[in-house]
Amino acid sequence: MSRFVLNEDVETATFDWGTAGMRGAPTITGCESYVVMDVELAPGFAHPFHKHPDQDEMIVLKAGRIVQWLGEDQRELGPGDSVHIDRDVVHGSYNDFDEPAHLQVVLAPAHGEGGYTAVDVSSEEPWASLRG
């Protein structure tokens, strides 16, 4: 259903790696085409290596810096930088810096009950050894 989504409408969930505000998900908008999240990674926090078997993803860094892994490649991203991740590609976002990182994340299509599913692979090789 078409609607305005105000900040007070955003449902925020807390994870081991930080917070995610569900700005656009089936439970909020009824849209099953995509999911939009506002993510904050506090200094020293990460969304460790994982993949989305049924979803493509775009991450746009709005503020702060992160070390973004895409497969076994990494790059430091700053405000305005982004990464596109095809479905089933392992990736991870790490805030190795002294300030919070704010990301806007879009996943498509919406999948699962909340619109978002991830498979943690951070304890599997080679991912478990990549960050030392």
Regions found by a protein language model. Name each.
Residues 30-34, 42-45, 65-66, 109-113:
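Short, charged/polar surface micro-motifs in flexible loops or helix N-caps
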Residues 1-33, 118-132:
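A short, N-terminal "cap"/entry segment at the start of jelly-roll beta-barrel domains
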Residues 79, 87-113:
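Ligand-binding loop in jelly-roll beta-barrel domains
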Residues 46, 53-79, 89:
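A short beta-strand-loop-beta hairpin characteristic of the jelly-roll/cupin
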Residues 25-29, 47-52, 94-96, 120:
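Short histidine-centered beta-strand/loop micro-motifs
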Residues 36-40, 58, 74, 82-84, ...:
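Conserved hydrophobic/aromatic beta-strand scaffold that supports enzyme active sites
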Residues 21, 37-52:
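Conserved short histidine dyad/triad with adjacent acidic residue
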